Amino acid sequence: DRHKCMNNQAIANKYQQLRRAVLAQAQNEFEQFEADFIGHIDLTEITEDAIRSQDEWDIPVNRQIGWDWRQVRDQYRRDHMARVELAVWHGEELCGLMIGKASEGKLVVKINYIQGGEVENPLKGYIVPIASRCAELFAVAIEADWIGIQDPIDDDDLLNYYRELGFDESDPFDPRNNALFKRVVVDED
């Protein structure tokens, strides 16, 4: 069905443009917020370079994650047009990765996978705020009211940190789901 195929391509292109706009806006906001970032920070999609750089991270065993970034990225590219992809760079150094997607009914944009880089990376402490802002900008663009972090790692410090960033509600659509939600705030300007 060629028409459906072309229509899907048009939708895919729309989301591609949206992802790029979100990355550009988030980068711009963080550069304004932290002048030291200008000329150093770069937000991109999860490129081959990003996957290769992530492979080289020296992550201690207790911070290992249970997924393969290449597999996750390829699966999301295949199955989810309305996805968010983020690689956070400081110069040539990859500092974090995130991938997420909009729910079927576009009610929520979820951060499904997120990982910060090596312990001493120059953007330590910024990965979650940057990822969260990207999810939020994507949500605003598709008129979703919520962003969420799916299956957050069960670590008290981390969970408190997520709450401080505003992820302090349980899933309003499925109370049994292990996720932290935050209502999207749209700037009235």
Where are these regions (language model features)?
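Non-catalytic substrate-recognition and accessory regions of acyl/acetyltransferase enzymes
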Residues: 1-125, 130, 137-148, 163-189
